Regions:
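Short, conserved charged micro-motifs
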Residues: 641-647, 677-684
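Helicase motor core with emphasis on the C-terminal RecA-like subdomain
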Residues: 2-8, 12-18, 29, 33-53, ...
Length: 745
């Protein structure tokens, strides 16, 4: 009997029947590896393999086998996922698997009926699928029930773990698991699932911290890459492509057809997906909305059927579910324009193509998006399309470089050449989460002495780098502002201001949200926007344009009607960080003469033109370029964090360095004013500063309040500045790059 046969025979009948029903001819390598760790050891497990490789089944087959052989007297498994839609998707998959087993599965989040949840509370058994926010609510509001609900908990499965490591939300989960362990009195095995992860050992440590268990990371077998990949480039041919026909007529302009029809880039993207079941990814909700509206206009103008859907976090649950169901339906043809919400592992069946509008920000994002296509034995297929303004004769040098195209090529080459994936960034000082968990623990446990509260909170894994004296600063601030209150017995309880925060359901989430206004058309909920336009104004949402008919400010409702046209909409947001390796590879692309086989004709021509510019202007030899007169440009080829540090360093020492008028674009270049011939003196002085060591703390001004996370507004400024310098700036890379640039002289 082979090892695979032994594992198969160990599974109960309902799992074997599931395997037969799905016509699997054999267990996959990831399923064999998972079975070995979960059956033969007491280790934690991190599974990293491509989308649709059977990771979920790999984890659950052995776990459910144990629950079948040795039933749990409480909830036996917690499955945590970052999206409600992912939980809904997995719920139906696991429910199908468990149909004949007698093992219960319950999904629990804000959209699930109270009656469904009540059944679990009355009889806690089986598998609980839950979001971090709902788990937080359970810890606060049902603290006394935790031992009964989870007393015999065996496993915690964390899905899409790459989206959580290095974030407040991921650290919140680690706090929650530690708190559950504390309340039930025993450790629980952890299983992490991820399609792409840049630092598996780092993620394994993240998963294991505080458990005392080793985490096994089976090596996924990386075969030869099989992709269908293409990149094409277009210049923006019609600058009025952001304007609707109604707007044009309002401005006294005559236009026969929608402006998008005159733009070859949009036409090309439309043709790429019009006959293929596709996902179209953009890097922001604004771009997603605009592109979906553009596709609909082109379809209307050509007389084609409108098959275009949209999916992002500001849409109503019903609209998102409509897109998911239509994409899953094998009999229905659809194209969905999406953001990161469709990047994760929601099963959408057989997808023929992924279209990427501009370059993704990360290798991780590229692989996740590419992996959404190519299931059932077919290679993944992606087309990246780039659009930029056609440079004018007097366009400055830095704007002659196609940064998006370079980034797209760099991301692909880094994975092909090195299998590089960005490692997760680790936060050392998550003060926003520290504020949140302080209130959460006090709300759950009741009165604690300051010493007991500090001991409990600072023992949680995310806060091991926080000094006691810094936590004391936070606690005093919380006392002074009524978030905490001291009793006559010198104990701490939640104060009046803290109670107000805790009363809102929004408290359970540690990611930043906004006070959104709900948009309704008749009885249908369309989605949410941040700022309400005046009555009569128009805005875009769900790939369509709406005109405001009525505002209900007290209830935060906007009543609208649908109108023709296309407009832009803006949401606040952070576009994420780009790794230094991507910038370094972009430089090599610009300076080498390699012809990349996936570049289409226009993209090849655009890259050749950029290489010609780089060679003629000296970019191939120098990072600091004289643009003429007093204008200079520095190309440091640093990622977001290091670029941010260098920019602050130049600003702080500008007078000493003899520079002024500092401006920048993304993390690509910095321009400034300086006397002609001052470059050597500038770099020599920068080297002297680097030799003394760059103090990141000194780059944050005394009055600065760097607010980024949800509860940063409640954290003292001195702690925010300390966290910013520690977690958002970096000195070593900048010091090295300064020496490298000086070496060019």
């Amino acid at each position: 009997m082979t090892r695979a046969d032994e594992i198969f025979e160990r599974f109960p009948d309902f799992i074997r029947e599931f395997i037969y029903t799905n016509t699997w001819e054999s267990l996959r390598p990831v399923q064999m590896a998972a079975a070995h760790t979960l059956f033969e050891t007491d280790h934690n497990l991190l599974l990293t393999s491509s989308t649709a490789s059977g990771k979920t089944e790999a984890a659950f087959f052995p776990i459910l086998t144990e629950l079948w052989d040795h039933p749990s007297s409480s909830i036996g498994v917690i499955y945590i996922a970052p999206l409600k839609s992912l939980i809904n998707d997995q719920f139906f998959r696991i429910e199908q698997l468990l149909d004949q087993s007698g093992i219960a599965v319950t999904h629990w989040h804000g959209d699930v009926a109270a009656s469904h949840k009540r059944k679990l509370l009355e009889n806690p058994r089986g598998v609980l699928q839950i979001t971090p926010e709902s788990l937080e609510a359970m810890l606060i509001n049902r603290s006394n029930d935790i031992p009964r609900l989870f007393g015999d908990l065996r496993y915690v499965v964390i899905d899409e773990i790459h989206t959580l490591t290095g974030t407040d939300r991921g650290n919140q989960i680690r706090c929650q698991l530690d708190r559950i362990t504390h309340l039930i009195g025993h450790d629980v095995r952890r299983v992490g699932l991820s399609a792409t992860i840049g630092d598996p050992q780092g993620a394994a440590e993240w998963l294991s911290e505080g458990t005392g268990r080793q985490t096994d990371v089976p090596i996924s077998e990386e075969g030869k890459i099989r992709w269908r990949l293409g990149m094409e480039h277009f210049y923006v041919q019609n600058p009025k492509a952001t304007q609707s026909k109604d707007e044009a007529e309002k401005n006294g302009e005559e236009i026969a057809e929608m402006p998008a029809m005159l733009d070859a880039g949009y036409e090309y993207m439309y043709d790429c997906v019009k006959d293929k079941k596709s996902l179209v990814f953009s890097n922001s909700r604004e771009e997603t909305e605009y592109l979906c509206a553009t596709f609909r206009q082109i379809a209307h103008a050509r007389g084609d059927r409108d098959v275009f859907l949209i999916h992002h976090g500001n849409l109503s649950a019903s609209l998102r579910e409509e897109a998911e169901l239509k994409m899953k339906n094998e009999e229905e043809f659809a194209v969905t324009c999406a953001t990161v919400t469709m990047e994760l592992g929601i099963d959408i069946g057989r997808l023929e193509r992924v279209l990427q509008n501009q370059a993704p920000n990360t290798v991780t994002g590229f692989l996740q998006r590419l992996g959404r296509s190519g299931r059932r034995g077919q290679p993944p297929e992606m087309m990246m399309v780039f659009r930029e303004e056609d440079p004018l004769p007097n366009t400055p040098l830095p704007q002659l470089i196609p940064w998006e195209l370079l980034r797209g090529i760099a991301i692909v080459q880094l994975y092909i050449e090195e299998r590089f994936i960005e490692p997760p960034m680790k936060k050392k000082l998550p003060y926003s989460l520290l504020f949140h968990q302080t209130l959460s623990i006090l709300a759950a446990q009741g009165e604690l002495t300051p010493a007991a509260l500090a001991a409990r909170v600072l023992s949680l894994p995310p806060f091991l780098n926080v000094k006691k004296e810094d936590y004391k600063v936070l606690m005093l601030s919380m006392l002074n502002n009524d978030y905490l209150e001291m009793t006559e017995e010198k104990g701490l309880i939640v104060g009046l201001a803290g109670e107000r925060l805790l009363k809102s359901f929004r408290f359970y989430a540690v990611f930043k949200d906004s006070e959104d206004y709900t948009v309704r058309c008749g009885s249908d909920e369309i989605g949410t926007i941040t700022t309400p336009p005046p009555v009569g104004d128009r805005f875009a949402l769900a790939g369509r344009v709406w005109e405001v008919e009525e505002l209900d400010m007290a209830r935060k409702l906007i009543y609208v009607k649908s109108v023709e046209g296309k407009m832009e909409i803006s949401w606040p947001g952070d576009f994420g960080e780009i790794h230094t390796k991507i910038l370094e590879r972009m430089k090599r692309i610009l300076l080498e003469d390699t012809v990349y086989p996936y570049l289409k004709e226009n993209a090849r021509a655009r890259l050749d033109k950029a290489r010609h510019v780089a060679h003629n202007t000296g970019m191939h030899e120098h990072s600091l370029i004289h643009l003429g007169g007093y204008s200079w440009c520095l190309f440091p080829w640093l990622g977001t964090r290091a670029f941010r540090t260098l920019r602050r360093l130049l600003k702080k020492h500008a007078k000493q360095l003899g520079i002024s008028g500092i401006e920048f674009e993304g993390c690509y270049y910095i321009t400034f004013k300086m006397e002609s011939g001052g470059d050597f003196a500038l770099m020599r002085e920068l080297c002297r500063i680097a030799e003394r060591g760059i103090d990141c703390q000194s780059l944050v001004e005394a009055g600065e309040l760097p607010v980024f996370e949800k509860y940063d507004d409640y954290v003292p400024g001195e702690l925010l500045r300390q966290a910013y310098a520690t977690d958002r700036l970096t000195a070593p890379l900048v010091e090295k790059r300064i020496y490298d640039i000086f070496g060019e002289y």
